[in-house]
């Protein structure tokens, strides 16, 4: 019998082992769809981004008008831009769901996969931040100024780092050109990290909703999960296209319709919606360095997830107390997101401070305590 090419060819063999003959737990739910959705998001963003980069000019005098030119004069330029801008929002929705799934089902116990995933999240956040600066609107400019300026809180070397990052004494042309360079480079870095992430995942195989070893009950990825993933793609592309075609500016900031002006500060500087929770944590501490540390900690705390797992059970499927905490954390993040979009005044300040405190308390204290308590209740 002739050898099967997809199983013997050096390149096809890798694809086959990752996407076709991959042994997959038979009981993984729709929460396991977000990995492939993130892959399709990344591909879409890179394709639309390349098309936009072909018409973009990374110069302070031309950036704003080059984006307007793309939308007005380039064939379907408006659609490409709207897909790229709103595609970023869907990218973040998917990654937050993906991380949430990992926390709920104890996927973080695959330490290498989890750690590369957290690095991917941080890289994605950096990419989105530098990308937001490129249209050179008011919020782009002031967002860049405020966030890069946070590095000046680092003792002794802070100011030097900021001026080095800016390429001058304020956000200006050198800043824009290097941000464009970074925004072009980072997605390819994300692609590389994704391959590392998948390599580590395929070492252990997927987790499943029961959190038990599923080697005795695995099915091939294709056709079962390839079909399920395609359904996921369609269910994501439908709202993305709806948003991009019917209300493309719904999630954007109206300030960004005005070209960047260093002499006029917008009344309320705020990032895109997907960074608002972190922005609320940053603002909730009335000290610059403290705020920066809290902001960093809000993301880096994810690295500690494997160390804070005290339960004998892997997932939260049969742990009602931990479930209650998990959904409280979810609600808390939504509150932080809302507070981040509000002005810095009473009562939003105190709500933000309480929500920030709750965020860290749940993750660092209550999750491990509850895990230990549930062990006790089950006489483990």
Curated annotation (Swiss-Prot):
UniProt entry keywords in alphabetical sequence: Electron transport, Heme, Iron, Membrane, Metal-binding, Mitochondrion, Mitochondrion inner membrane, Respiratory chain, Transmembrane, Transmembrane helix, Transport, Ubiquinone
Record field: transmembrane: 34-54, 78-99, 114-134, 179-199, 227-247, 289-309, 321-341, 348-368
Cofactor names: heme b
Location(s), subcellular: Mitochondrion inner membrane
Membrane topology term: Multi-pass membrane protein
Residues the entry annotates as binding heme b b562: 84, 183
Additional information: Heme 1 (or BL or b562) is low-potential and absorbs at about 562 nm, and heme 2 (or BH or b566) is high-potential and absorbs at about 566 nm.
Subunit structure, interactors included: The cytochrome bc1 complex contains 11 subunits: 3 respiratory subunits (MT-CYB, CYC1 and UQCRFS1), 2 core proteins (UQCRC1 and UQCRC2) and 6 low-molecular weight proteins (UQCRH/QCR6, UQCRB/QCR7, UQCRQ/QCR8, UQCR10/QCR9, UQCR11/QCR10 and a cleavage product of UQCRFS1). This cytochrome bc1 complex then forms a dimer.
Protein name stated in the entry: Cytochrome b
Native source organism of the sequence: Balearica pavonina
């Amino acid at each position: 019998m002739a050898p099967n090419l997809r199983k013997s060819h050096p390149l096809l063999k890798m694809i086959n082992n990752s996407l076709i003959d991959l042994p997959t737990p038979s009981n993984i739910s729709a929460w396991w769809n977000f990995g492939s959705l993130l892959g399709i998001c990344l591909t879409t963003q890179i394709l639309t981004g390349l098309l936009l980069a072909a018409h973009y000019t990374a110069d302070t005098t031309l950036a704003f008008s080059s984006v307007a030119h793309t939308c007005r004069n380039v064939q379907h330029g408006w659609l490409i831009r709207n897909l790229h801008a709103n595609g970023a929002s869907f990218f973040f929705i998917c990654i937050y769901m993906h991380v949430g799934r990992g926390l709920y089902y104890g996927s973080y116990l695959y330490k290498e996969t989890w750690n590369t995933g957290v690095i991917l999240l941080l890289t994605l956040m950096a990419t989105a931040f530098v990308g937001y600066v490129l249209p050179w609107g008011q919020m782009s400019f002031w967002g860049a100024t405020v966030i890069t300026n946070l590095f000046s809180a680092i003792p002794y070397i802070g100011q030097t780092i900021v001026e080095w990052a800016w390429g001058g004494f304020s956000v200006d042309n050198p800043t824009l050109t290097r941000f464009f360079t970074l925004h072009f480079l980072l997605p390819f870095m994300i692609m590389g990290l994704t391959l590392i992430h998948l390599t580590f995942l395929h070492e252990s195989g997927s987790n499943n909703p029961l959190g038990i070893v599923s080697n005795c009950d695995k099915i091939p990825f294709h056709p079962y999960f390839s079909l399920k993933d395609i359904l996921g793609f369609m269910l994501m592309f439908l709202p993305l296209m709806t948003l991009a075609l019917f209300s493309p500016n719904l999630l954007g900031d109206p300030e960004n319709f005005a070209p960047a002006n260093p002499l006029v500060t917008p009344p309320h500087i705020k990032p895109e919606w997907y960074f608002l929770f972190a922005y609320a944590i940053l603002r909730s501490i009335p000290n610059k360095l403290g705020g920066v540390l809290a902001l960093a900690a809000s993301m880096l705390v994810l690295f500690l997830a494997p160390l804070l797992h005290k339960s004998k059970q892997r997932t939260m499927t049969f742990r009602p107390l931990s479930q209650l905490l998990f959904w409280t954390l979810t609600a808390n993040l939504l509150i932080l997101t809302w507070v981040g979009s509000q002005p810095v005044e009473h009562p939003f300040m105190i709500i933000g401070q309480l929500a920030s405190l709750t965020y860290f308390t749940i993750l660092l204290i209550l999750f491990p305590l509850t895990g230990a308590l549930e062990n006790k209740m089950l006489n483990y």
